[in-house]
Amino acid sequence: MRHGKVHRKLNRTAEHRKAMFANMCASLIKHEQIVTTLPKAKELRPIVEKLVTLGKKGGLALRRQAISEMKDQDQVRKLFDVLAKRYADRQGGYTRIIKAGFRYGDNAPMAVIEFVDRDENAKGLDSGQAEEKAA
C-alpha cells in the first residue's frame, strides 16, 4: 500500500533529488519560467512556494535557511528583495504549472512551471555559456 508516501522518488537517490530541486529552484527564480517534466514540476512547486514564503517573512535566519536549501546566493537575494515584494499581498499560489505536450524521444509529459505575474524580461536572461564568453 502507498499510505504515507507523499513525494516521488523520480528514480534518483535522496542526495541527487535534493541537488536537482535546489538547481531547479535557482533556475526558476532566475528565469521565472522553466520547462521540465510534469512529475518534476509537481514536486518542485511546493518547494518553491515555501521558499517564496520564507522570502516574504524576511530576516537573517530565514535568509540563511533559504541559502541552505538553494545554494545560490544571487537567487536568494532576488527571492528576498524582488519576489518577496511582488507577492507581498498574495497568500500562496505563487506558481502555475501548464502542461506542454510530450517530449520527442521518450514521450515524457512536459510542463512549464512559472511564477504568476512573472517578469517577461527575465526569461532566458543570462543563460548558458555563450553569455559568459561574450562578456
UniProtKB/Swiss-Prot annotation:
Highest taxon in the source lineage: Bacteria
GO biological process terms held by the UniProt record: translation
Keyword Chloroplast attached: no
Database matches in InterPro entries: Ribosomal_bL17 (IPR000456), Ribosomal_bL17_CS (IPR047859), Ribosomal_bL17_sf (IPR036373)
One Gene Ontology term, aspect cellular component: cytosolic large ribosomal subunit
Database matches in HAMAP family: Ribosomal_bL17
Protein name: Large ribosomal subunit protein bL17
